[in-house]
C-alpha cells in the first residue's frame, strides 16, 4: 500500500513539473491544444463507421420485410441520434481546445 502512495505522489510531482515547463512556453501549449483537438476528433471516425453499418443493416431489414419499414426506421433514427451525441461531444471538446485553450 505504501508503494502505491509513493508512486502516486511521484506521478503527481512529475505532472506538476511538466505542466510548469509547458506553461512557460505558450507555443507548446497551443501545439498541445491542436494535438488534443485532433485526437478528440479521432472518435468521430468510429461513430461514422458505426452509423453507416447500422444504416446498411436497416436497409437490409427493410428489403427483407417491407412491412416493418416504419418500426425499423424509428429504431434507426433513435440509434443514430444516440450515437451522434458522442461525436458532437468530441467536436465540442476540440473546439474548446482550439479556441479557449
Swiss-Prot record:
High-level lineage: Bacteria, Bacillati, Mycoplasmatota, Mycoplasmoidales, Metamycoplasmataceae
Subcellular location(s) per record: Cell membrane
Pfam family, one: ATP-synt_C
Claim: Membrane is one of the keywords in the record: yes
Gene: atpE
Record keywords, A-Z: ATP synthesis, Cell membrane, CF(0), Hydrogen ion transport, Ion transport, Lipid-binding, Membrane, Transmembrane, Transmembrane helix, Transport
Functional summary from the UniProt entry: F(1)F(0) ATP synthase produces ATP from ADP in the presence of a proton or sodium gradient. F-type ATPases consist of two structural domains, F(1) containing the extramembraneous catalytic core and F(0) containing the membrane proton channel, linked together by a central stalk and a peripheral stalk. During catalysis, ATP synthesis in the catalytic domain of F(1) is coupled via a rotary mechanism of the central stalk subunits to proton translocation.
PROSITE patterns (alphabetical): ATPASE_C
Protein name according to UniProt: ATP synthase subunit c
Positions of transmembrane segments: 31-51, 81-101
Gene Ontology cellular-component annotations: plasma membrane; proton-transporting ATP synthase complex; proton-transporting two-sector ATPase complex, proton-transporting domain
Family: Belongs to the ATPase C chain family.
Site positions (Reversibly protonated during proton transport): 84
SUPFAM superfamilies (alphabetical): F1F0 ATP synthase subunit C
Domain of life (superkingdom): Bacteria
InterPro entries reported in the protein's UniProt record: ATP_synth_csu_bac/chlpt, ATP_synth_F0_csu, ATP_synth_F0_csu_DDCD_BS, ATPase_proteolipid_c-like_dom, F/V-ATP_Csub_sf
CDD domains: ATP-synt_Fo_c_NaATPase
UniProt main location, coarse: membrane
NCBIfam families, sorted: ATP_synt_c, PRK07159.1
